[in-house]
Structures are given as C-alpha cells and as structure tokens.
Amino acid sequence: MPSNILKPHPKAIDRRQALQTLLGVATACSAWAAPMAWAQSARPGQSEGRLVVVFLRGAYDGLSALVPHGDANYYALRPSIALAKPDGTAQTTLRLDNTFGLHPALAPLMPLWRQGVLTALPATGSPDPTRSHFDAQHQWEIGTPGKSGNAAGWMNTLAGSLAGTSADVRAISAQSIEGAENKPQAVGVGEANPQILAGSAAVQLVAKGQAATRQGAVGDERTRDAVMRLYSGQDEISKAFRAGADSRRQTAKTLSNAMSESTTSGMGSNDMNKDISREMQLANNGAGNAQGLLLDAQHLNTLMRQDRRLRLGFLSAGGWDTHANQGNALGALANNLGNLANTLVQLRREFSQTNDVVVVASEFGRTSAENGTRGTDHGHGNTMWIMGNRVNGGRVHGGWTGLGIGNLHENRDLPIHNDFRSVFAQLLRSTQGLSNANIDKLFPGFAWDKSLDSMLRT
Amino acid sequence: MYPNQTTAAALPRRNALKVIAVCAMSPGLAGSLNAYAQASNPFEKTQSTQLFEQWRAMSRVGYGPTPQLVRALQTASSPKVWTVQQIDLAYAASQVAPLMASDLSSLNAPLPDIFDAAQRERQARAAIKAVTADSAGNTNTNELLNNRNNRRMDFSEPADPLYFNRSMVQKAAAWRLGACSQPNDENPLLARMTEFWFNHLNVYSGKGAVRPFIGHYVVNVARAHALGKFEDLLLASARHPAMLYYLDQFQSVADGSPAGQGRLRGLNENYARELMELHTLGVAGGYSQNDVHETARILTGWTVGPNEANGFRFAQRLHDTGRKVLMGQYYPDGSLNSGEREGEQAIRRLARHPKTAARISLRLAQFFVSDSPAPALVSALAQTFQNSQGDIRVVLRALLESNEFWHPENKLFKTPMDFACSALTTVSSTDKLADSTDRRRLILTENYLSEAGQPLHDWQTPDGYKFDAATWLVPEALTRRADFALAITRQVSDLDFLQPYLSATTRAAIAQEKPALRAGLALASPDFQYK
C-alpha cells in the first residue's frame, strides 16, 4: 500500500511505461527510448500533417453508411433494413455513383465528398477472423492482427517516434512537467485509457464531455499546494499525479478560453452550442450513443490547435453493436450516423491543412444479411473513411466484389480486400514521411498495398 | 439510509485475544514490507505487519476501514481468520433480502409490477410524442422530457410514470452505493462479490428496456448467487429480463418464425456469443462461429415473461426443434424432447467447462490479488472450482487463504469504484446518525464515477470494467480523485482511525494543513489509492 514499495507488474508494463517516460524515467526496453528524427515532413515547406483517428467501438454497420444500392444482393439480403434506392427524396440513399450511396443521415458529408476531400474504402479490416469485439479492438489498437498479449498501442509508438521531430519547440512554462522532450505528441479525448494510446510515450488523456473544462481541486492554489505536498515523492504515482495536475490545468484553461472566445466572437458557436446542448439532452435520456462525440471532437480541435506539438488525436464512440431493430433511414443507427456526420464536419473545420488526415474505422463489420431480429450480427470486412486535402476523394477506393454469396467471407460477411494497416501505411508515408521500415515497427508484417496508391494525391 | 441494525458482520467473535492498541506514532506501512519479510515467526508479526494485513483485509474483502471494522480486525485472532470468517457470513447474508431504505424498496418489487410500470412509461411517452410531432414528423420529446430536474436522489414521492425507468436506475445506484459503504448493513465481502458478478455478467442501464430491471438484477442475480454455485448464477442471469433484453435474447426465435403481416423472424446471435466469449469459456475457449450459431438455436424461445414471478418465459412455439451440435455434443440428446431443458443443459455444461473454471479463477485472482496473478494460483483455483462443481464459497476460501492474497508485493491499485466506495465508507462511518446515508453524498459519488469513466451500472459493452492499474492509473484521472475526496469530506472534521494506516510522510504532510482539509487529504493521499 505505501507507494515507495510499488513495482509495476510486468503485464502492466506498457501502460505504466507511458507514465515512466512521461516522468523522465528511462525505459531501457523501449525501442523508442531515444526519440529519433525518423520522420520528415512529407513535403518540405508544408505544415506537418496531423492524424486523427475516430474509432467506432462495437462494429458499426458499414453497409448502412456506404450503401451498395447498385447491388441487387443488398436488397435480397436485407429485406427490412436496407436503405431505399436513391430517388432524390428524403429518407432514401444519397447517390454517390452507380454502385454506392450515403445513408441519408450522412447528408452533412455530401459537400466534403463533392469537394473531393472524403473517400471510403468499402471492404477493409483486419485479416484475423475473430468475431470478438474485444479481441478485434485490441488487435486493431496494437496494430498486430492475431496477437492477444500485451503490447503498446500503435498510436503511442508513433507518438514516441515523432517526438523530437517537431520544428516547433515551445518555450517551457514555469509549471511545465519534468522534461520538455517528454511533452505529449498525442491526445485522446473521452476514454479513460484507450489501448491505442498505451505505451512508453507520453500522451495526454482528457476526460469525456464537460468534465474536461474543469480544473477542480488543483485549480485552487491553496488546495493544490496541499495536495501536491502529498505527492511530492519520486515514486510512480506521485510523478503521475504531478504530471496530471499540470496537464489538467492546462487542458481546462485552454478549453475554457476557447469557449469564452467563441461565445464573445460568435464564431459559428451558436449553432454549435445548440448542437451540443441537444447532444447533452440526448445523453441525459440515454438516447443517442455517439452522443458526446461532438463535444469531445470540439475539445480535440481546440487542444490540437493550441498545442501544435500534438500531432495525433484519438476519439471514440460506442453504441454501434446493432444486433436488433437497427432501423434504416430512421432509428438508432441513423441517429448515431447523424452524430458521426456532424462530428466529421466539425473535425474538418480544424483539420483542413495540407497533410491533415481524419480516419474513421471500426473493429470489424457486420453480417451482410440481416438477422432474425432486424439487426445484424458480427461480421468481417467494413467501410473505412478518410478525410483530408491529400485524399483523392469524391470516389470510392479499394477492392469491392459485391454481395454475391460466392464473394462473401464464410458465405456471410464482407471480405477484406484491403488490410487496415495498408491503408494507414499509405497515409503515414504520404503525410508523415514514414519509411516502410518505420511503418513496419507500428504494424509488424504489414504489406504495401499498391492497389491503394491512387488513394492520395501526391 | 438503512434502519440502524447490527449484523453478524459487526459482531466478531471475541477470541480472548488481547486488543492490540494502535499507537498513533506508528511508522505507518512504509516499513511493512521489510517487517513482513523479516517476520521469521508468523506468530510474532510486527505491528506494521499487523496494520498492513488489517488494511488488506478491510480494503479487499470490503471497501476499506471504518472504526468498527478496525475494532473487529483488532479483536480477531488474525486478519486472515477475520477474512475467512466473512465467507460464511457473506453467504448467509446473500440468502436473505438486503436491507433497503423504504423509499428504495421498489427496485426489488415483484417483476410483473416492474413490467407494468415500464409499460405505463412507454405509453405516457408515446402520448407526448404524438402531441409534439412537428410538421416534418420529428418529435421533440427530449426537450419536453428534460424540462424538469431529475438529478436529485429524492424518492419520497412516488415516481412520475413518465420517469419510472430513470427513478429505478437511480434507486439501484443509491442502493449499491449505500451497500458498498455501510458494512454494518451489508456484509463487505458480499458487496464485493456483488460487484464482481455484476461486472462479469454486465448489463447496461443505458439500454431502454434494461433500465427498470437493473436494481432487481443486482439484488436477485449478482447478490443472491454471489457465493453459491456458478451455474445457478449463470442460469439466473440467463433468465433475467435485464439480460434477456440487454443482449437481445428475448427476441431470438427459430429462423422463419411468423412475425405477423406475413413477415418472418429468426435468430439473433448476440447472447449466445457473449455467453461463451465472456460469461464462460473465454475468447480462446475452443468454440467456433458454428458453435455460436448452434447455441443461439438451442436458446431460441428463451424470452421475457411479463406475468411470471421470475420474469422469464420459454416460448416452445418459437423454439428451433431441430438437432444442434454444440462443441461435439447433440442437443437435444437422445432422451429429451426439444425444449427449454436443452438450453439449461447447454448453459450448465458451459458453466462446468474447464475453460470456464480457468477464466473465472483468473478474474477472481485479478479482482482480489494482483493484476497479473501467479499462474500457479490461478490453476489451483481452477482445480478447486472444478472439484467443487463451481462452488464459489469453496473457491473464495482457497483464494483468501492463499499466500498470494496476503503477499505484500501483490499490490492492487483502486479502481474508481473502489476509491469511491472506500471514501464513502470512511466518511459515512463518522456520521452521528448511522441510519441515514446522506443522499447528496451519493450524488457526488455517482457523478465522480461517471467522470472517472466507471459509471455505475452504465458500461455499455458486455465485457464489464477492467480492474487493472494499467487502465486506471492515469495522470489527469488521479487529480479527479482529489476533487472527490475534498468534496465528500466538506463536513467531516477528522478521520483519525485512518492515521495508523498512512505512511509517516503522508501523515506529516497532512498535519501541516488546516484541520478542515485533513480528512480530504487523507482520502486523496497516495496511500489511500491502494487496496
């Protein structure tokens, strides 16, 4: 119980290492212990790219988001939950081309599609066949299909590798935590400690919702001094606490300032606030599930705008596991997709510089056919979305062989035509300047997928 | 919050042992590891070892110390003896209804009444929707429904029919937080095991249909079977409306069953998969996608029974009567007609499977011993589980008597739930009136848990919460513990009984501060974050 006899458990080492690094403790077993300048800005003179991943936990139904309206099998497989063919009226699929269209709740994304900054890959995922949410998420987050043991999250590894490459070295404030070289390069908003950000590199983890804007006890000088005295030791928990107090105050100040600025300048905030207060209402009623995502995205925007050292962002939303009564144009899934669309529009406002990229993905897809309760069960391949100026958007990329039974994985699910790691490899090489050797450190054994070479503009 | 009653747990047998006076100048536990290692004769443990073991017993078998528990530990012949005694006390307590403040008791109402009230809420909401649909057909129910404050835990008035579900969720939270923080009213080990099983067989209060049944599920599934046979617990969860709704089992029927208007209904794999992946075998338990499908077929027709005392009904006409093969065995077997029995047999078989024994044993060891428990301990527990046909009491005895449970190096960092309940426990123990839990404190606690990422009964996915430090020891989140500690101790002058358990460094730091801050700082201290 006393903290001076604490030793991290071997199993917990990855996430605990994050703390140790954050606290300036050498981590001998980490390949990234010494930050290396292993990534160069992809295009000299351009802004450094920032990558935001929005992860939909629970396996969202990609066939309802990117609707294959041109495939007769789609309607045969889903008699009661298919989205109606596009006919220009409300509640029907929004036509993108002869094969695909958008769910009507994704209408806010149409302008981005037309501008050519948004693309979708309809049959991507992990080659591992697991249909367990939790295993699939774990493997996706550590970047290694089939691996179940403890490992660092790939965004954490990436954050560690980017450390020191930032051209912008900010002056260290008086309250700065120990060691500027350990300033986080990655920020996650909403989850306690997502696996994808767990590892030896320092990351910033911010609370979900309004809580992120409050400094709490450490905001009051007297109380802070008293609490800090309790945590003045050199043990792990004390260092973590001090780093947390620092980071939390900074986070809350940044977010509060941004909020008061937007309300005084009226910068599009009224609509936003209306959106967000509606989100909150939904949340209070336990209605929507991507509820809160919009506010978390707004916080992510603010934090990454204010601290240019933050190059990687992570957001997630649950509630996509639609086993029953998922609806079609209306219903629970439609509400969630609507929240997602508003979130992406919001992220686009911030992440619209040359090499910025926003990715939306899920751990796996759902069955091609509806089940016996007007929902869908756990599947395999799924649609991934990519948004950014470098994206060769306005069209679908990656493989697609339709929903004919002979073309389905195990006669039931979408196959995987493009490995999710290959998609990220393209993005990381183009917008972060990573070499294949370095990408292989994030995704051991990944293979370059030439069929995706046209996905990005050079 | 409860009538002031003394339960067996609060009356430890006096073992004619001398009460060990706790010296206020004790060095705290900082030196206890050395002391423990050097205690050559277990009957001559040093005082700091005593304190260390008392803390471990109170914080892991329950949710931390109260003056009364401290006295009980001091008068027991050893912390280990006290700990093992709790097993039978907890079992006995689980066999009778829990103490419950009268304004919370409806959470445990007969199931048909809960179904009725939930139905009335649906009708009331539908009526509002009909009135407020705008020209585009959109409804603004949310704005209407939010025009009132429902955040108070005041249940003195009967619930508005429109807010029945919400009141049931809040009552469940109020009872849970009371039960985990009032060791006089609820045996602390029983509260712990209720937490463990609820988490293992998680249901989610955010899913509409589940909401009114949350409290009933906690009391009649997790608590009632907390120290019984695992297969009985599993079957109770399988048949409870909260689980039937949560994982969609209530509507899974034989493929091609008629659904009116010429439409057909059929299978839903959700419950069948999680039953194997999470409740029993584990993801590497050797089942295939086909086994998931066959289990789903076996369980077709298991649905809610709004008029049944146990809330469960087996609908034979919606059951798939064909032959199924689950992990190499036929269902129904030769002696049976196809029906409810084959589902019960399949669930019992999964419950007794060696992979299940291993999975439950690992999770129990992680809950009570360490994030990475020794494989030898886990396999010994799994063997005990199998030898006793999944008798949880027998497994717990092996666990709490193990050297690993008492070993100082097997540390556990408190989860937000541990921290919230232990803070609430210490604070409540200072109340002059032991029969009323301050509801404002419960609201504070509930809000803290939400902010910390462990909202009560509100984890969306069936895997339940993680318990390890890797998940919860996060810089910013640590500072939120301090917020809660300071907020919940506003009217608490001192927590002197905690002093001996804090390190000298911590005690010195606290002593510097003004008295009003001291109780909060004790709870916010690094020492208090471990159990």
Model features per residue range: what roles?
Chain B
Residues R211-H225, K229-A398, S402-V427:
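Active-site substrate-binding loop specific to GH73 endo-beta-N-acetylglucosaminidase modules
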Residues N41-Q50, W55-L69, H353-S388, R393-K531:
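Flexible, low-complexity segments enriched for small/polar residues
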Residues Q68-Y91, G215-A226, L381-N387, A508-A511:
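Amphipathic alpha-helical segments that form the core helices of the histone-fold
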Residues P42, T46, Q50-V96, R239-P241, ...:
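Cell-wall polysaccharide-cleaving catalytic domain and substrate-binding groove, primarily
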Residues L69-M193, H200, S205-G208:
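N-terminal accessory alpha/beta regions
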Residues M1-L11, V22-A30, Y36-A39:
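N-terminal secretory signal peptides
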Residues N41-F43, A173-P183, Y217-N220, K229-F230, ...:
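Short alpha-helical segments and helix-capping/turn motifs at coil-helix boundaries
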Residues A191-M193, E231-D232, V394-V395, L517-R518:
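Alpha-helical scaffolds flanking conserved acidic
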